[in-house]
Amino acid sequence: MNTEVIAIIPARFASSRFPGKPLADMLGKSMIQRVHERIAGVVPRAVVATDDERIRQAVEDFGGEVVMTSPECSSGTERCREAFDKVGRGEKIVLNLQGDEPFIQKEQIDLLISAFDKPETDIATLAEVFSSDASFERLNNPNSPKIVLDHGGYALYFSRSVIPYLRGVQPDSWCRRHTYYKHIGIYAFRPTVLRKITSLPQSTAEQAESLEQLRWLEYGYRIRVLQTQQSTIGIDTPEDMDKAIAYLRSQGME
């Protein structure tokens, strides 16, 4: 394990689409426990950052490391920064891993960390290619932000809308005619950059799309995007949870 890496898992109880999501039961374990167990098997430290006593107690009950953060944090990255300032031990890379990704793969975490083999990398994230047979309905889902990349693998823009627009092509054919990238919302930062980007005021594009990474782009920070071959099952709604539990059962992970 790379001892210069710490993973922080922001977890909020309040959610407009799925209140109490971190503590939702997944066949005998809470979602936050399943997330923590996956990550703790890959990196030397995995710390849950929360502002809710119920989550703190649940994490302590299963033996995980947890830190309380301010309820005033406006984003997961702000919560990640506050947690690192409180419990960091001089690690060189800070991972911000979502508390609603219980199926995150070891290969994805390793890939994210590998971005920092290049000294010019300050921020890294992952993307997955939409399959060529993906429907326009799936592509157009605003809960699956899309990314446009430059030739060097850095993000030009993130959007909940479909970008780019294929002029003169029927929407159901877009994924066959163009390579679209789905953002997987996990990040890695150098600590100095994490502190800088969380000190910036919100940007106009960030406010419009409700995507905090647009703030970093608007202020001139570069985000390196690595392509993963593994799919994940993010959980945004109770319906997503039903699918996740069905997947657990199908894999004999009860």
UniProtKB/Swiss-Prot annotation:
One of its GO terms (biological process) is CMP-keto-3-deoxy-D-manno-octulosonic acid biosynthetic process. One of its GO terms (cellular component) is cytosol. It is found in: Cytoplasm. Activates KDO (a required 8-carbon sugar) for incorporation into bacterial lipopolysaccharide in Gram-negative bacteria. This is 3-deoxy-manno-octulosonate cytidylyltransferase. It comes from Porphyromonas gingivalis (strain ATCC 33277 / DSM 20709 / CIP 103683 / JCM 12257 / NCTC 11834 / 2561). The keyword Transit peptide does not apply. The keyword DNA repair does not apply. Keywords: Cytoplasm, Lipopolysaccharide biosynthesis, Nucleotidyltransferase, Transferase.
